[in-house]
């Protein structure tokens, strides 16, 4: 199983360069998404990509209902680890990790799963922490 950052789901819904790889990843194995990253996915799809909320729900709910995509809530342990990761790695200019990024990394590290992302900062910290990475192309097609 792989933990998905928000971007892979945005790419899937907005038909961006990583969409085919995300589809393959979901076909091959179940994937997880922290609820904070699911929220970010929905927000970006609506606010930035101007996708209607109904279309987003129609695309994501079947994946969630059949268990192809599992939404995972964050608890106290993930909160402590995410805060520790952000305190150790965050730098506004060189390594701008959001709290959502850190929760993604905390879930992946605690479960022993890989992360799928196109975010260079997430990839750098994941590798530093011994977390496996599925590096996806970003919205321009560039792979980190």
Residue ranges and their predicted role:
Residues 42-88:
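Active-site-proximal, substrate-binding regions of enzyme catalytic domains
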Residues 69-121:
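Active-site neighborhoods of divalent-metal-dependent phosphate/nucleic-acid chemistry enzymes
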Residues 35, 73-75, 137-139:
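Residues at the C-termini of beta-strands that transition into short coil/loop
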Residues 20, 43, 80, 123-124:
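Alpha-helical elements of the RecA-like P-loop NTPase motor core of helicases
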Residues 1-37, 48-62, 129-131, 140-144:
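Short, well-structured N-terminal submotif of metal-dependent ribonuclease cores
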Residues 105-144:
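Acidic, PIN/NYN-like endoribonuclease modules and their adjacent C-terminal/linker elements
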Residues 8, 43-46, 104, 122:
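Hydrophobic side chains within alpha-helical segments
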């Amino acid at each position: 199983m792989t933990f998905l950052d928000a971007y892979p789901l945005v790419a899937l819904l907005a038909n961006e360069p990583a969409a085919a790889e995300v589809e393959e990843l979901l076909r091959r194995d179940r994937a997880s998404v922290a609820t904070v990253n699911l929220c970010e996915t929905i927000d970006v799809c609506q606010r930035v990509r101007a996708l209607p909320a109904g279309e987003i729900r129609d695309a994501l709910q079947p994946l969630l209902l059949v268990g192809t995509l599992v939404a995972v809530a964050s608890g106290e342990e993930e909160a402590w680890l995410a805060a520790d990761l952000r305190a150790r790695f965050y730098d506004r200019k060189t390594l701008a990790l959001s709290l959502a990024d850190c929760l993604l990394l905390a879930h992946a590290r605690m479960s022993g799963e890989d992360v799928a992302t196109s975010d260079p900062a997430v990839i750098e910290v994941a590798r530093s922490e011994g977390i496996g990475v599925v590096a996806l192309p970003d919205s321009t097609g560039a792979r980190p």
